Amino acid sequence: MLYFSTNNKAPLVNFKDATINGQAPDKGLYFPKNIPVLSPGFIKNIADYSDVAIAYEIIKPYVGDKIHAGMLKKIVEETINFPIPLVPINDTISSLELYHGPTLAFKDVGARFMSRCLGFFVKNQPKKVTVLVATSGDTGGAVANGFYDVPNVEVIILYPSGKVSTVQEKQLTTLGKNIHALEVNGSFDDCQQMVKDIFARAADFTNLFLTSANSINVARWLPQQFYYFFAYKQWADKNNPPVIAVPSGNFGNICAGILAHASGLPIKHFIAACNANDVVPNFFETDIYEPKKAVATISNAMDVGNPSNFVRILEIFNQQTGDLKKLVSAKSVSDDETRATLKKVKDEYNYLLDPHGAVGYNALEKYLQQHPAQKGIVVETAHPVKFFDVVEPIIGSPVAIPQIIQDQLKLKKQSELMENNPEALRDFLMKL
């Protein structure tokens, strides 16, 4: 498989080079030259396959011959060595729980897959490989966990000061060793821009080999397709495929779902469920894509004012927004609606959503009210305990804290304060 840049001003590369480079040299995102089409027999008999076999079948054409079959199977096994259950909430809505991995967030899958691919690719790299990642919350913890103690790899995580939850901050600031947490005086978009600015000047860092672990990296983005196949495998009514609502911030997760659909996975409709950061919902209404400064919400991992992966979604549809709107809709949900939904679902169905899942549930519920013949899935992206400081006042009772989180909360934070300035990041990298 070859990959081109969405800006169309960079050479084609293979999976290995796309993974190592992160972003294309023309600042575009890598995108597969061809979208593999899965056989109808595979889809029809999906219930007969193990999750590992499904994931291997999906990712194999994207990797090509850059990782041999035995190693790729091992990477897949280590990536999804935890359950991803589809849990009914009520008669019409089920929750796809993506939070049973080591950091209790959906990003564990992409981070684990990418860290193992990159570790395989850079074993003999003479320069020190430096992974730069901006996080609005869960990416940082998942990347830190995935790359912790990987030889010859340093990980630099930028996160907006005061804009991630207590648990999220502990997960990305307490490991030490090859994991460096930089607490930036700014927003997630500022952090992401600092990373992009550094990549644009990669030639300045002669002693480092820079790459990214954000969902712009194909090795983090592509394995997110797995969830959607696992959901369909567990979906009872194969003759009536689900509507899937995806809490959306940087749009990597829903983009992977749409890519899975393009490969042949039966999905009736996708809903991009956004918070007050409504750039994409506005685009669906006006056909004008106008990035904005991110605003802070209680679903902080989606506080993104210029979603990087939206360009990939447009690429899947060959820039045909009419075709896009047939399969996908976008909905903005306020914090008040999020709180009300979270409380209602807990009170009525005894199911506890996190704030991001509540955004997804709200958008899905509204869609199903207009399409009563359909049933749907909300993609639940994180365990509610990761946002206990938001959730507990809403439901009026404590969230049960898993032992793994109790242990993390006792650890000492290790971070370095940094101004919102690419030069400050450049100076930090020069000292590595």
Model-predicted regions and their roles:
Residues M1-L432:
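PLP-dependent amino-acid enzyme catalytic core
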